[in-house]
């Protein structure tokens, strides 16, 4: 029962945007950028950061589901550790959205539910498949973050600092999943994941 309550609390905090970072926000070492971005740039950056926030909501759901279905205690611990770092990402993105006078996606409950279902299915397929799913997810997120970094205005050092740290963490999570025995996913599954990601990013940018 304690585990259920804890996991349910984590889900509510992820959806509501009430998470707290266990690490310092990478943007805190930079000065505020009030007035440095044009209005159109602020809107675009807000859209990008909303997409990244949704990605972290989904990461919480995926890791939570895969943690609950893990057979091996070491795998469960690895999922929990990664989820805590992803929670940092969630808090950083939420803070940046507030700085930009914007908001998270209105569809966060839907994104969370869908990601949890996918993570549960991956976890039920076995630890090696589940770890392989983590590795592929983190690889695609790494590519996605690199694309967003290319789109950031030169004056937006705060968003850049956040996304660069997030990308470093995602690379490390993917490497750890492969090292723990994650198996490569079939090409059709990888393609399906990319397609689902495109739907999410397109909708979350606006809604």
Swiss-Prot record:
Keywords: Cell membrane, Iron, Membrane, Metal-binding, Monooxygenase, Oxidoreductase, Ubiquinone biosynthesis
Residues at which Fe cation 2 binds: 86, 138, 170, 173
Cofactor field: Fe cation
Enzyme class name: oxidoreductase
Cofactor: how bound: Binds 2 iron ions per subunit.
CDD domains: DMQH (cd01042)
Tree of life domain: Bacteria
Pathway in which this enzyme or protein is active: Cofactor biosynthesis; ubiquinone biosynthesis
Localization in the cell: Cell membrane
Binding positions (Fe cation 1): 56, 86, 89, 170
InterPro entries found in the cross-reference section: COQ7_proteobact (IPR047809), Ferritin-like (IPR012347), Ferritin-like_SF (IPR009078), Ubq_synth_Coq7 (IPR011566)
Function: Catalyzes the hydroxylation of 2-nonaprenyl-3-methyl-6-methoxy-1,4-benzoquinol during ubiquinone biosynthesis.
Protein name, entry field: 3-demethoxyubiquinol 3-hydroxylase
Organism: Cupriavidus pinatubonensis (strain JMP 134 / LMG 1197) (Cupriavidus necator (strain JMP 134))
Gene that produces this protein: coq7
């Amino acid at each position: 029962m304690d585990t259920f309550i804890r996991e349910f609390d984590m889900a509510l905090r992820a959806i509501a945007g009430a998470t707290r970072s266990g690490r310092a926000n990478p943007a805190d070492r930079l000065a505020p950028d009030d007035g440095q971005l044009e209005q159109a740039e602020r809107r675009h950056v807000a859209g990008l950061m909303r997409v990244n926030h949704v990605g972290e909501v989904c990461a919480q759901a995926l890791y939570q589901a895969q943690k609950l279905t893990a057979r091996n205690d070491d795998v469960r611990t690895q999922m929990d550790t990664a989820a805590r770092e992803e929670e940092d990402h969630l808090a950083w993105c939420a803070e940046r959205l507030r700085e930009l006078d914007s908001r998270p996606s209105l569809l966060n409950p839907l994104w969370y539910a869908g990601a949890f279902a996918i993570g549960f299915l991956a976890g039920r397929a076995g630890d090696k498949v589940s770890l392989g799913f983590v590795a592929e997810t983190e690889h695609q997120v790494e590519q996605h973050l690199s694309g967003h970094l290319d789109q950031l205005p030169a004056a937006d050092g705060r968003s850049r600092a956040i996304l660069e740290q997030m990308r470093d963490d995602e690379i490390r999570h993917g490497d750890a999943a492969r090292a723990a025995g994650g198996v490569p996913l079939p090409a059709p599954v990888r393609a399906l994941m990319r397609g689902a990601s495109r739907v999410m990013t397109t909708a979350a940018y606006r809604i």
